[in-house]
Regions:
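Conserved PLP-anchoring active-site segment centered on the Schiff-base-forming lysine
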Residues: 1-10
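PLP-dependent enzyme catalytic core of the Aspartate aminotransferase-like
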Residues: 3, 17, 42-48, 145, ...
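Active-site phosphate-binding strand-loop segment of PLP-dependent enzymes
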Residues: 10-11, 30-96
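Helix C-cap/helix->beta junction micro-motif
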Residues: 19, 82-83, 113
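Hydrophobic beta-strand scaffold residues
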Residues: 23, 87, 117, 247-248
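Active-site PLP attachment segment
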Residues: 106-149, 153
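Structural signature of PLP-dependent enzymes
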Residues: 151-170, 176-205
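Conserved PLP-binding catalytic core of the aspartate aminotransferase-like
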Residues: 186-243
Protein backbone atom coordinates (compact mmCIF):
# COMPACT_ATOMS: atom_id res chain seq x y z
CA UNK A 1 0.00 0.00 0.00
CA UNK A 2 0.99 3.61 -0.57
CA UNK A 3 0.46 6.44 1.88
CA UNK A 4 0.33 10.06 0.70
CA UNK A 5 -0.11 13.32 2.56
CA UNK A 6 -3.56 14.84 3.06
CA UNK A 7 -3.68 16.80 0.83
CA UNK A 8 -1.21 15.97 -1.92
CA UNK A 9 -0.82 16.57 -5.65
CA UNK A 10 -3.93 14.97 -7.16
CA UNK A 11 -1.95 12.98 -9.71
CA UNK A 12 -0.03 11.15 -6.99
CA UNK A 13 -3.12 9.17 -6.11
CA UNK A 14 -4.10 8.66 -9.74
CA UNK A 15 -0.68 7.33 -10.75
CA UNK A 16 -0.34 4.87 -7.89
CA UNK A 17 -3.91 3.65 -8.22
CA UNK A 18 -3.35 3.24 -11.94
CA UNK A 19 -0.36 1.04 -11.12
CA UNK A 20 -2.53 -1.18 -8.92
CA UNK A 21 -1.66 0.17 -5.47
CA UNK A 22 -4.12 0.89 -2.71
CA UNK A 23 -3.63 4.54 -1.76
CA UNK A 24 -4.24 5.88 1.75
CA UNK A 25 -3.51 9.23 3.41
CA UNK A 26 -1.63 10.38 6.48
CA UNK A 27 -2.42 13.69 8.27
CA UNK A 28 -0.49 16.72 7.05
CA UNK A 29 -2.29 20.05 6.67
CA UNK A 30 -4.11 21.68 9.57
CA UNK A 31 -6.82 23.93 8.15
CA UNK A 32 -7.55 25.37 11.59
CA UNK A 33 -4.05 26.64 12.34
CA UNK A 34 -2.85 27.00 8.75
CA UNK A 35 0.15 24.79 9.41
CA UNK A 36 1.11 21.15 9.75
CA UNK A 37 -0.30 18.33 11.85
CA UNK A 38 3.20 17.02 12.33
CA UNK A 39 2.60 15.04 15.52
CA UNK A 40 -0.41 13.34 13.94
CA UNK A 41 1.59 12.72 10.76
CA UNK A 42 4.45 11.12 12.67
CA UNK A 43 2.09 8.96 14.72
CA UNK A 44 0.32 7.76 11.58
CA UNK A 45 3.58 6.83 9.86
CA UNK A 46 4.78 5.09 13.03
CA UNK A 47 1.69 2.87 12.91
CA UNK A 48 2.10 1.71 9.30
CA UNK A 49 2.77 -1.94 8.46
CA UNK A 50 6.36 -2.78 7.54
CA UNK A 51 7.30 -2.26 3.88
CA UNK A 52 4.52 0.29 3.34
CA UNK A 53 5.41 2.97 0.80
CA UNK A 54 5.34 6.51 2.19
CA UNK A 55 5.27 9.31 -0.37
CA UNK A 56 6.95 12.45 0.96
CA UNK A 57 7.36 15.86 -0.67
CA UNK A 58 11.09 16.60 -0.48
CA UNK A 59 10.50 20.36 -0.64
CA UNK A 60 7.90 22.97 -1.61
CA UNK A 61 4.88 20.85 -0.69
CA UNK A 62 2.22 20.87 -3.39
CA UNK A 63 -0.45 22.08 -2.80
CA UNK A 64 -0.02 23.59 0.68
CA UNK A 65 3.39 25.27 0.53
CA UNK A 66 4.11 24.05 4.07
CA UNK A 67 7.31 22.02 4.46
CA UNK A 68 8.69 19.78 7.18
CA UNK A 69 11.57 21.39 9.09
CA UNK A 70 15.07 19.92 9.23
CA UNK A 71 14.50 18.73 12.80
CA UNK A 72 11.19 17.15 11.85
CA UNK A 73 12.81 15.35 8.92
CA UNK A 74 15.18 13.68 11.37
CA UNK A 75 12.18 12.30 13.24
CA UNK A 76 10.52 11.11 10.04
CA UNK A 77 13.70 9.35 8.92
CA UNK A 78 14.03 7.63 12.30
CA UNK A 79 10.46 6.32 12.10
CA UNK A 80 10.84 5.19 8.48
CA UNK A 81 13.96 3.27 9.43
CA UNK A 82 12.55 1.77 12.62
CA UNK A 83 9.31 0.67 10.94
CA UNK A 84 11.10 -0.71 7.85
CA UNK A 85 9.11 1.51 5.50
CA UNK A 86 9.95 2.49 1.93
CA UNK A 87 10.27 6.24 1.39
CA UNK A 88 9.32 7.66 -2.00
CA UNK A 89 10.54 11.27 -2.19
CA UNK A 90 9.01 13.55 -4.79
CA UNK A 91 11.37 16.38 -5.75
CA UNK A 92 9.47 18.50 -8.26
CA UNK A 93 10.57 21.99 -7.16
CA UNK A 94 14.20 21.81 -6.09
CA UNK A 95 15.63 25.30 -5.87
CA UNK A 96 12.32 27.10 -5.38
CA UNK A 97 12.33 26.74 -1.59
CA UNK A 98 15.61 27.84 -0.01
CA UNK A 99 18.17 26.86 -2.64
CA UNK A 100 19.31 23.89 -4.68
CA UNK A 101 21.55 22.41 -1.99
CA UNK A 102 19.21 23.29 0.86
CA UNK A 103 16.17 21.75 -0.82
CA UNK A 104 18.09 18.61 -1.75
CA UNK A 105 19.62 18.06 1.69
CA UNK A 106 16.83 15.74 2.79
CA UNK A 107 17.82 13.20 0.13
CA UNK A 108 21.33 13.01 1.55
CA UNK A 109 19.90 12.52 5.05
CA UNK A 110 17.88 9.49 3.95
CA UNK A 111 20.91 8.00 2.19
CA UNK A 112 23.17 8.68 5.20
CA UNK A 113 20.68 6.81 7.37
CA UNK A 114 21.21 3.74 5.21
CA UNK A 115 17.68 3.70 3.83
CA UNK A 116 16.59 2.34 0.47
CA UNK A 117 14.60 5.09 -1.22
CA UNK A 118 12.98 6.18 -4.44
CA UNK A 119 13.44 9.76 -5.61
CA UNK A 120 11.43 11.26 -8.45
CA UNK A 121 13.02 14.44 -9.76
CA UNK A 122 11.44 16.91 -12.17
CA UNK A 123 13.24 19.58 -14.17
CA UNK A 124 10.06 20.79 -15.84
CA UNK A 125 9.72 23.84 -13.61
CA UNK A 126 13.31 24.60 -12.63
CA UNK A 127 14.37 24.63 -16.30
CA UNK A 128 11.12 26.06 -17.69
CA UNK A 129 10.67 22.90 -19.75
CA UNK A 130 7.07 22.33 -18.77
CA UNK A 131 6.11 21.02 -22.20
CA UNK A 132 9.02 18.56 -22.24
CA UNK A 133 8.31 16.83 -18.90
CA UNK A 134 11.96 16.21 -18.11
CA UNK A 135 12.72 14.19 -15.01
CA UNK A 136 14.35 11.15 -13.50
CA UNK A 137 13.65 8.29 -11.13
CA UNK A 138 16.57 7.50 -8.83
CA UNK A 139 16.65 4.36 -6.71
CA UNK A 140 18.98 3.71 -3.77
CA UNK A 141 19.31 -0.01 -3.02
CA UNK A 142 21.20 -2.01 -0.42
CA UNK A 143 23.31 -4.01 -2.88
CA UNK A 144 24.30 -4.24 -6.53
CA UNK A 145 22.18 -7.35 -6.93
CA UNK A 146 19.14 -5.55 -5.57
CA UNK A 147 19.61 -2.50 -7.76
CA UNK A 148 20.12 -4.73 -10.79
CA UNK A 149 16.76 -6.36 -10.11
CA UNK A 150 15.09 -2.98 -9.70
CA UNK A 151 16.64 -1.72 -12.94
CA UNK A 152 15.41 -4.81 -14.76
CA UNK A 153 11.85 -4.22 -13.57
CA UNK A 154 12.03 -0.54 -14.48
CA UNK A 155 13.17 -1.41 -18.00
CA UNK A 156 10.21 -3.76 -18.41
CA UNK A 157 7.79 -1.07 -17.23
CA UNK A 158 9.39 1.51 -19.51
CA UNK A 159 9.33 -0.79 -22.52
CA UNK A 160 5.62 -1.47 -22.14
CA UNK A 161 4.81 2.16 -21.37
CA UNK A 162 6.70 4.62 -23.58
CA UNK A 163 9.73 2.60 -24.74
CA UNK A 164 11.99 5.62 -25.27
CA UNK A 165 11.54 9.10 -23.80
CA UNK A 166 11.85 12.28 -25.90
CA UNK A 167 15.49 13.37 -25.91
CA UNK A 168 15.21 17.11 -26.59
CA UNK A 169 14.41 18.31 -23.06
CA UNK A 170 16.87 15.92 -21.46
CA UNK A 171 19.60 17.07 -23.82
CA UNK A 172 18.97 20.68 -22.79
CA UNK A 173 19.23 19.86 -19.08
CA UNK A 174 22.38 17.80 -19.66
CA UNK A 175 23.98 20.59 -21.69
CA UNK A 176 23.28 23.20 -19.00
CA UNK A 177 24.38 21.07 -16.05
CA UNK A 178 27.47 19.87 -17.90
CA UNK A 179 28.73 23.35 -18.71
CA UNK A 180 30.06 25.34 -15.70
CA UNK A 181 29.22 28.70 -17.25
CA UNK A 182 25.68 27.71 -18.23
CA UNK A 183 25.10 26.01 -14.90
CA UNK A 184 26.15 29.12 -13.00
CA UNK A 185 23.80 31.23 -15.12
CA UNK A 186 20.94 28.77 -14.57
CA UNK A 187 21.50 28.73 -10.80
CA UNK A 188 21.52 32.53 -10.78
CA UNK A 189 18.26 32.74 -12.72
CA UNK A 190 16.63 30.07 -10.56
CA UNK A 191 17.65 32.04 -7.48
CA UNK A 192 16.14 35.18 -8.95
CA UNK A 193 12.88 33.35 -9.57
CA UNK A 194 12.88 32.05 -6.00
CA UNK A 195 13.32 35.58 -4.67
CA UNK A 196 10.63 36.91 -7.02
CA UNK A 197 8.08 34.35 -5.85
CA UNK A 198 8.75 35.22 -2.20
CA UNK A 199 8.37 38.90 -3.03
CA UNK A 200 5.04 38.24 -4.76
CA UNK A 201 3.82 36.46 -1.63
CA UNK A 202 4.43 39.62 0.38
CA UNK A 203 2.83 41.80 -2.30
CA UNK A 204 -0.20 39.51 -2.30
CA UNK A 205 -0.59 39.84 1.46
CA UNK A 206 -0.12 43.61 1.33
CA UNK A 207 -2.47 43.94 -1.64
CA UNK A 208 -5.23 41.94 0.03
CA UNK A 209 -5.02 44.14 3.11
CA UNK A 210 -5.13 47.27 0.96
CA UNK A 211 -8.16 45.86 -0.88
CA UNK A 212 -10.08 45.62 2.37
CA UNK A 213 -9.51 42.02 3.48
CA UNK A 214 -9.65 42.06 7.28
CA UNK A 215 -8.63 38.43 7.78
CA UNK A 216 -4.95 37.95 8.62
CA UNK A 217 -3.48 36.51 5.41
CA UNK A 218 0.15 36.71 6.53
CA UNK A 219 0.33 32.90 6.57
CA UNK A 220 0.86 33.15 2.80
CA UNK A 221 4.37 34.46 3.44
CA UNK A 222 5.25 31.47 5.62
CA UNK A 223 4.57 29.05 2.76
CA UNK A 224 7.29 28.32 0.21
CA UNK A 225 7.46 27.20 -3.37
CA UNK A 226 5.26 28.01 -6.32
CA UNK A 227 1.88 27.47 -4.67
CA UNK A 228 -0.21 28.86 -1.85
CA UNK A 229 -3.08 27.23 -0.01
CA UNK A 230 -5.22 30.35 0.22
CA UNK A 231 -7.90 29.07 2.59
CA UNK A 232 -10.63 30.07 0.14
CA UNK A 233 -13.62 27.77 -0.20
CA UNK A 234 -14.71 25.94 -3.35
CA UNK A 235 -17.56 28.42 -3.85
CA UNK A 236 -15.15 31.34 -3.58
CA UNK A 237 -12.76 29.76 -6.08
CA UNK A 238 -15.61 29.15 -8.52
CA UNK A 239 -16.61 32.81 -8.22
CA UNK A 240 -13.03 33.91 -8.85
CA UNK A 241 -13.00 31.96 -12.11
CA UNK A 242 -16.48 32.73 -13.37
CA UNK A 243 -16.78 36.38 -12.32
CA UNK A 244 -13.21 37.69 -12.34
CA UNK A 245 -11.12 35.41 -14.55
CA UNK A 246 -8.78 34.49 -11.70
CA UNK A 247 -7.89 30.80 -11.79
CA UNK A 248 -6.98 28.35 -9.07
CA UNK A 249 -8.13 24.91 -7.97
CA UNK A 250 -11.34 24.26 -6.05
CA UNK A 251 -9.24 23.36 -3.00
CA UNK A 252 -8.03 26.95 -2.77
CA UNK A 253 -4.59 26.38 -4.25
CA UNK A 254 -3.17 29.31 -6.20
CA UNK A 255 0.02 29.60 -8.22
CA UNK A 256 2.02 32.46 -6.71
CA UNK A 257 4.53 32.19 -9.56
CA UNK A 258 1.78 33.35 -11.96
CA UNK A 259 1.47 36.69 -10.18
CA UNK A 260 3.22 39.76 -11.55
CA UNK A 261 3.10 43.52 -11.41
CA UNK A 262 0.41 43.67 -14.08
CA UNK A 263 -2.12 41.32 -12.52
CA UNK A 264 -1.51 41.51 -8.76
CA UNK A 265 -3.94 44.39 -8.15
CA UNK A 266 -6.73 42.67 -10.08
CA UNK A 267 -6.13 39.40 -8.23
CA UNK A 268 -6.17 41.10 -4.83
CA UNK A 269 -9.33 43.08 -5.63
CA UNK A 270 -11.06 39.95 -6.91
CA UNK A 271 -10.16 37.88 -3.85
CA UNK A 272 -11.34 40.71 -1.60
CA UNK A 273 -14.74 40.72 -3.33
CA UNK A 274 -15.32 36.98 -2.93
CA UNK A 275 -14.25 37.18 0.72
CA UNK A 276 -16.80 39.86 1.59
Amino acid sequence: QVWVSDPTWDNHRAMFEGAGFQVNTYPYYDATTGGLKFDAMLSAIDALPAQSIVLLHACCHNPTGYDITAAQWEQVIAVVKERNLTAFLDMAYQGFGYGIAEDGAVIAKFVAAGLNIFVSTSFSKSFSLYGERVGALSVVGSSKEETDRVLSQLKIAIRTNYSNPPTHGGAIVAAVLGNPELRALWEKELGEMRVRIKAMRQKLVDGLKAAGVTKDMSFITTQIGMFSYSGLSKDQMVRLRSEFGVYGTDTGRMCVAALNGKNIDHVCASIAKVMQ
